[in-house]
């Protein structure tokens, strides 16, 4: 695994860089930022940060959500936010087809191996949390993400229909 990035929990001091990260997705025509715990839908960074923080604990998690750890992937050389990734510790009925993990990479930083590195690092977080496996979904036409999942040990489990498109669920066993 490369050692170019580190995962860090969102913080207020990251607001400006986080908003620039989000804006780059929007300018690129992307309305959904996977792995962002609805950062793409929030008006206020502070409210989103409060929600993300609450969702890290079973005592404070939103009643419609599951305990989730959300991270920015930050490049070590310049502290630029490269991506976002989240880890859902359990799956409810809504999430059973979406999986334990979602991630996104900044449009200008794609095809540089960051997604593989991010997923590899979140697998270590999952293992440290006592998880034995994670499920992760990928749309059929997302060949790049499929490679990331497979290179991190993903094993095909099943296919399903999601909002008019076919997606696959992969399982990654944590050793």
How would you label these PLM feature ranges?
Residues 136-146:
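Conserved beta-strand-loop-alpha-helix junction that forms the acyl-donor binding cleft
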Residues 126-137:
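Conserved GNAT acetyl-CoA-binding A-motif
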Residues 137, 155-169:
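Conserved catalytic-core motifs of GNAT/GCN5-like acyltransferases
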Residues 74, 91, 100-111, 139:
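A short, internal acetyl-CoA/4′-phosphopantetheine-binding micro-motif in the GNAT/acyltransferase core
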């Amino acid at each position: 695994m490369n050692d170019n990035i580190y995962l860090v929990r969102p913080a207020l001091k990251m607001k400006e860089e986080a908003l620039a990260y989000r804006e780059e997705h929007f300018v690129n025509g992307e309305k959904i930022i996977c792995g962002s715990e609805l950062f793409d839908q929030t008006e206020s960074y502070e409210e989103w940060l409060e929600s993300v923080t609450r969702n890290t604990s079973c005592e404070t998690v939103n009643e419609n959500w599951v305990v989730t750890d959300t991270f920015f992937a930050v490049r070590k050389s310049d502290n630029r936010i490269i991506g976002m990734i989240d880890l859902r510790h359990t799956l409810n009925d809504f999430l059973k087809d979406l999986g334990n993990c979602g991630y996104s990479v900044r449009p200008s930083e794609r095809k540089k191996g960051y997604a593989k590195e991010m997923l590899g690092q979140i697998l270590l977080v999952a293992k440290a949390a006592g998880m034995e496996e994670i499920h992760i979904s990928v749309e059929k036409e997302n060949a790049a993400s499929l490679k990331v999942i497979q290179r991190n040990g993903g094993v095909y489990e099943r296919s399903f229909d999601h909002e008019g498109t076919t997606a696959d669920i992969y399982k990654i066993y944590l050793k």
